[in-house]
Amino acid sequence: MRQSRLSIIFAAALFFKCYALTVALPMAKAEDGSLEKDAFTSLLNDEATENSLGDAELSSMTKSRAPRVIVIAADANLWRDLRVLHNGLPLYKRRVDENNQVVEHKDVGQDLTIPILRRDTMRCMVGRVYRPCWEV
C-alpha cells in the first residue's frame, strides 16, 4: 500500500514537471493545438543544451536558472518514526515508551537473555487476552 502511494506521488511530480511550462503559456497558443508539441520540444531542447554545454557555459546557465533545492531529513527521529510505521508498530506506542520510564520487574520465570525492548513488544496469552510478557 505504501509503495503504491509513493509511486502515485512520483508520477504526479513528473506529470506536473512536464506540464509546468504549458501552464504559463497564453490561451491563444492553446487554441491552435500546438501547446503539447511546444512544451515537448522545449523540454527536449533544454535536455539537449544541458548535455552539450561546456564547463563555462554550464556555470552561466545555472546562474540564470532558479536554484534547485534538495531536502534531506537530518533529524534521526524522523527516520526512526518512518521505520516504526513501516514495521507496523503504532507511532503513539513508540513515543509513550520513550517518554515513560519502564520499571523493570525481575521475575524468576522471565527469560533474562531477551533484551527489555524485545520483551516489551512480545505478547503472551494471559487468559483470553494478549499482554506484554513482562506483565505476566
UniProtKB/Swiss-Prot annotation:
InterPro entries: Prepro-melanin_conc_hormone. It comes from the Eukaryota. One of its GO terms (cellular component) is synapse. Disulfide bonds join 124-133. The keyword Disulfide bond applies. GO terms for biological process: chemical synaptic transmission; neuropeptide signaling pathway. One of its GO terms (molecular function) is type 1 melanin-concentrating hormone receptor binding. Residues 1-20 form the signal peptide. Keywords: Cleavage on pair of basic residues, Disulfide bond, Hormone, Neuropeptide, Signal. The keyword Disulfide bond applies. Belongs to the melanin-concentrating hormone family. PANTHER family: MELANIN-CONCENTRATING HORMONE, PRO-MCH. Plays a role in skin pigmentation by antagonizing the action of melanotropin alpha. Induces melanin concentration within the melanophores. May participate in the control of the hypothalamo-pituitary adrenal gland axis by inhibiting the release of ACTH. This is Pro-MCH. It comes from Oreochromis mossambicus. The gene is mch.
